[in-house]
């Protein structure tokens, strides 16, 4: 089993797809990496030679931010927005949509599950 950037790649998948299991690498970037290292994208992970795995590993480590480093970078960027008090930072802090989406209805994914609010009791009509 090939281990790249701390992730075990699935053995039976094509290397082009297997690389997408690494956080920060999608299909386009996977194809880019394979073109740089001259590895056939249709090769199965289990059929890769040690030299191929080493070439891919060094390409990923030297030229791309992936996994923990990328997650840390994203968290620091969001924290910076919150610290300097930008509109986007405030939206992140409040757990609301950041990019201008409506919130009167929808936005359930970002806001979470509905919490019911106890309504006022109707006062009995006095006549």
Curated annotation (Swiss-Prot):
It comes from Trichodesmium erythraeum (strain IMS101). One of its GO terms (molecular function) is structural constituent of ribosome. Gene3D superfamilies: 1.10.8.50, 30s ribosomal protein s13, domain 2. The keyword Ribosomal protein applies. Part of the 30S ribosomal subunit. Forms a loose heterodimer with protein S19. Forms two bridges to the 50S subunit in the 70S ribosome. The keyword Transcription regulation does not apply. Keywords: Ribonucleoprotein, Ribosomal protein, RNA-binding, rRNA-binding, tRNA-binding. PANTHER family: 30S RIBOSOMAL PROTEIN S13/40S RIBOSOMAL PROTEIN S18, SMALL RIBOSOMAL SUBUNIT PROTEIN US13M. This is Small ribosomal subunit protein uS13. Belongs to the universal ribosomal protein uS13 family.
């Amino acid at each position: 089993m090939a281990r790249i950037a701390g992730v075990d790649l699935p053995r039976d998948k094509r290397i082009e797809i297997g690389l997408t299991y690494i956080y920060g690498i999608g299909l386009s970037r996977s194809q880019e990496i394979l073109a740089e290292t001259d590895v056939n994208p249709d090769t199965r992970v289990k059929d890769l030679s040690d030299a191929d795995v080493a070439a891919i590993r060094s390409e990923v480590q030297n030229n791309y931010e992936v996994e923990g480093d990328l997650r840390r970078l994203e968290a620091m960027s969001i924290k910076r927005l919150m610290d300097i008090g930008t509109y986007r930072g405030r939206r992140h802090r409040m757990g609301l949509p950041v990019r201008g989406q409506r919130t009167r209805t929808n936005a359930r994914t970002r806001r979470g599950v509905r919490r019911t609010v106890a309504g006022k009791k109707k006062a009995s009509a006095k006549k």
